[in-house]
């Protein structure tokens, strides 16, 4: 009986996908592509671009941060959407 109950709990968790987290790219500028699993409840990714003395800079990650004027920001809500 305990085995049946445990099996039902596991199947329910798998079917409901309770542990789902968003995955976003998180590399900086021209670095090799890397991804990161976002914290639970964080459902968006961002791509932030600006220029400074080093040239054009790109930052990617989880969430949708507030930015200062002059910084381009694109937020999205699907897997790996911020490349």
UniProtKB/Swiss-Prot annotation:
Superkingdom as given in the UniProt entry: Eukaryota
UniProt keyword annotations, A-Z: Acetylcholine receptor inhibiting toxin, Disulfide bond, Ion channel impairing toxin, Neurotoxin, Postsynaptic neurotoxin, Secreted, Signal, Toxin
GO MF terms held by the record: acetylcholine receptor inhibitor activity; ion channel regulator activity; toxin activity
GO terms under cellular component: extracellular region
Residues annotated as signal peptide: 1-21
Function: Binds to muscle nicotinic acetylcholine receptor (nAChR) and inhibit acetylcholine from binding to the receptor, thereby impairing neuromuscular transmission.
Protein name: Short neurotoxin D
Organism placement in taxonomy: Eukaryota, Metazoa, Chordata, Craniata, Vertebrata
